[in-house]
Amino acid sequence: MEIRKIAGIAPDDRAAVDEAFAGIEPLPVACCNWPAEFPYAPEVSFRMFHTGDWLMLRFDVAERYTAALVTEDNGEVWTDSCAEFFIAPDTGMYYNFETTCIGRMLLGARKSRTEAEHASPEVLAGVKRYTTLPCGEPFAEREGDNRWSLTLAIPPQALFRHALTDWSGLKACMNLYKCGDNLSHPHFLSWRPIRTEKPDFHRPEFFGEVTFEK
């Protein structure tokens, strides 16, 4: 899969960003890998492009149950309505960007689920987050026709254990997920299938290969 390059767009130029995303085909995050135990599957898709300076990623979510109780970055964001992006720029390490529907983010550089270094506040502040829900405002679970979008603008420097200065030409592996561990209907969806007995997103052997257009 190739990530298209669209140069000259600033993340804060929302009209230009929306226009660029309109030309990108959405891809489903629809692999329900453990249907016997976790059959519930909200509708989730993502779109992605890069400018060289920024990786632009948008999740669109339609779900029945939504909650946002985590109020701090690097907290237990996976317990809320959470969209996740994992990327491995090489075989030795991967990064997990886990973001709730109100923009609280966990970011780590990892060799495995248990071997991790969390990003500093300065690195986290460099990742721009835009959500259609009130950003940063927590709420208990809501049941209904809940629809929300989350856009991330990720600079290459967010891969803080690598010396990246430009996304152009990068070859990597990635997977994208949607979860909500503490919701009344927990779910664990992925873009690429995960072939494990129990839910486990920290499995880079199941990532898909991607190339960022030069």
Label the predicted regions.
Residues 1-214:
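Structural preference for beta-rich elements and adjacent junctions enriched in aromatics
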